[in-house]
Design a protein with these regions (language model features):
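Amphipathic, interaction-prone secondary-structure segments
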Residues: 13-36
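Alpha-helix capping and helix-coil boundary motifs
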Residues: 28, 77, 81, 94-95
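A contiguous, well-structured "functional interface" segment within a domain
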Residues: 1-8, 66-70, 101
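Eukaryotic intrinsically disordered, low-complexity regions enriched in proline/serine/threonine/glycine
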Residues: 2-21, 42-47, 119-120
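C-terminal charged interaction modules
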Residues: 89-131
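Acidic, aromatic-enriched beta-alpha/helix-loop junctions
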Residues: 35-84
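A generic structural signal for short, non-catalytic loop/turn and secondary-structure boundary residues
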Residues: 7-8, 30, 52
Length: 131
């Protein structure tokens, strides 16, 4: 696992894998404002599914929700978040949409953003006020 600590920023590459000509990268980032999970893909499957050669999605949640996310991912809170995310996405065919469904089912609020060649789409956390 690669990590970088820069002031109030910590970034962990929790999963990087290639399958054929496709690549998938999952990154966990801790900031003063909370936790971010980035999910990036590129390759033929991404192009076929989304009409873009690459796609990067990001889920943002408050640090106070970390224990709830670890429990939803791993079934207990003793695992670290990076390990729980790595284990979750190491399962065959697990996509970011599966994580969003899991968080919705567990009642864990989050904000979502996605960027690809077509532009950027954002969904703020329910109840958040856009500035």
């Amino acid at each position: 696992m690669g990590d970088t600590g820069i002031g109030l920023l910590e970034r962990y590459v929790v999963l990087r894998e290639r399958c054929g000509g496709d690549e998938r990268v999952v990154v966990l980032e801790r900031r003063a404002a909370g936790l971010l999970v980035y999910y990036g893909t590129r390759g033929e499957q991404t192009s076929e599914a989304f009409g873009s050669a690459w796609r990067v999605s990001c889920v943002r949640l408050g640090e106070e929700r970390e224990v709830g996310l670890v429990c939803a991912l791993h079934g207990e809170s003793s695992a670290g978040l990076a390990d729980a995310i790595r284990s979750y996405f190491s399962q065959s065919d697990t996509e970011l949409s599966d994580l969003l469904d899991l968080m919705d089912g567990a009642g864990i609020p989050y904000a979502y953003a996605c960027a690809d060649e077509g532009g950027i789409v954002c969904r703020e956390e329910a109840g958040a006020i856009a500035s």
